[in-house]
Design a protein with these regions (language model features):
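Nucleic-acid-processing active sites and adjacent nucleic-acid-binding tracks
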Residues: 24-54
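Low-complexity, acidic/Ser/Thr- and charged residue-rich accessory regions of DNA metabolism proteins
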Residues: 237-238, 272-316
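Acidic, metal-coordinating catalytic cores used for nucleic-acid/nucleotide bond scission
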Residues: 53-64
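Two-metal-ion RNase H-like nuclease active-site motif
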Residues: 6-14
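Phosphate-backbone recognition surface of nucleic-acid-processing proteins
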Residues: 201, 206-283, 315
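Long, charge-rich intrinsically disordered scaffolds of nucleic-acid metabolism proteins
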Residues: 2, 12, 69, 76-195, ...
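Mobile genetic element proteins and their domesticated derivatives, centered on retroelements
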Residues: 13, 21, 52, 79, ...
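Short, solvent-exposed helix-loop connector elements
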Residues: 116-129, 151, 240-244, 271-288
Length: 316
């Protein structure tokens, strides 16, 4: 649905060194360097409140988004996968910086009514997300190195010492996570989520972090924010395969998958897990189903400020 509010519409294609800018009125293309001083000068030239569409590009869009928001403009961060499909849907035959900037402006003009403007996340969200991502990179590197050195015995003792140093760094990251949570007054929320079978400290931290990013009205919106809502492709009598949208932070989904692998062995969820396996579902499908259930339970606990009641317990 086209935007109803009369605002100037701008599409910006972001690269590391350059911003290619399309102004819908007066149908003008321009470019500036992707540096704060240049961005500030350009923002001052805009005619009043403006709606700006930007494709998320690594971290290169962050300065533009934050400065535009501070200047009073509405900023819309567009998912790259969604924009790519939109290009195909409207018959786009080329992909250049200029065409992407035009496409972003067109997308915002036609679909803006259904989009939500970007708002800055709470400070604690950025800190927790940064620490969780750094830890994920650390563990990924450790796993890769351990596998590649598995058959090399000549430096086994030295490598073992190296792995222990990685483990110590991991513990320091987790300690820092607890400090951030304590300063933000969120340790109680983490403990509330940890009461759920399979959910440990890291998964609980990720769930609390995600919950504090937005004002979620329902479990469905929370699941969608985690990128665990389903993409449906049905037509006539044919029911297509379901896929996760996988939007948002991939580390939260990875931690939830690990939590589901642990929960499926617990008394509370073993029956659920085996039932769906016996119905013919694949292991990954069942683990995704269980991950979604765990996330929904965590959301309900945080939303209602209630305590977890294990399956079979009497709820007062």
């Amino acid at each position: 649905m086209a935007m109803r509010v009369s605002k100037s519409i701008v599409g910006v294609d972001v690269a590391k060194a350059e911003l290619v800018i399309y102004l819908a009125d007066p149908d003008l293309l321009t470019s500036i360097t992707n540096e704060k001083p240049a961005i500030k000068r350009w923002l001052k030239t805009l005619p009043g409140p403006t709606a700006i569409a930007v494709e998320a590009t690594n971290i290169y869009h962050v300065d533009l988004v934050e400065l535009a928001y501070e200047s009073g403009h509405d900023v819309y961060i567009i998912d790259g996968f969604q924009l790519s499909n939109y290009r195909k849907g409207v018959g786009g035959r080329s992909k250049t910086d200029a065409s992407d900037a035009r496409l972003l402006g067109r997308f915002l003009k036609n679909e803006g009514e259904d989009l939500r403007p970007w708002t800055p996340p709470p400070a604690v969200y950025g800190k927790l997300q940064s620490l969780l991502r750094r830890r994920a990179s650390l563990i990924q590197a450790k796993t890769s190195l351990t596998q590649s050195w598995a058959n090399d015995t000549s430096l086994k003792a030295v490598f073992a010492t190296f792995v222990k140093s990685i483990d110590r760094l991991d513990l320091l990251v987790q300690k820092k996570l607890k400090e951030v949570l304590r300063e933000a007054g969120l340790l109680e929320e983490v403990a509330r989520c940890q009461a759920i079978e399979g959910i440990g400290f890291l998964t609980a931290t990720a769930l609390v972090m995600a919950y504090n990013r937005g004002d979620f009205t329902s479990g469905d919106s929370y699941i969608a924010f985690l990128g665990m809502d389903l993409r449906v492709s049905d037509s006539g009598q044919k029911n297509g395969r379901r896929y996760l949208t996988k939007r948002g932070c991939s580390e939260v989904r990875r931690l939830l998958h690990n939590a589901a692998m642990s929960a499926c062995r617990s008394n509370a969820w073993k029956e659920f897990y085996n039932h769906h396996l016996n119905c013919g579902k694949a292991t990954t499908q069942v683990l995704v189903m269980l991950s979604r259930k765990l996330a929904r339970i965590a959301f309900a606990l945080m939303k209602n400020q209630s305590e977890y009641q294990p399956k079979g317990a009497v709820i007062a």
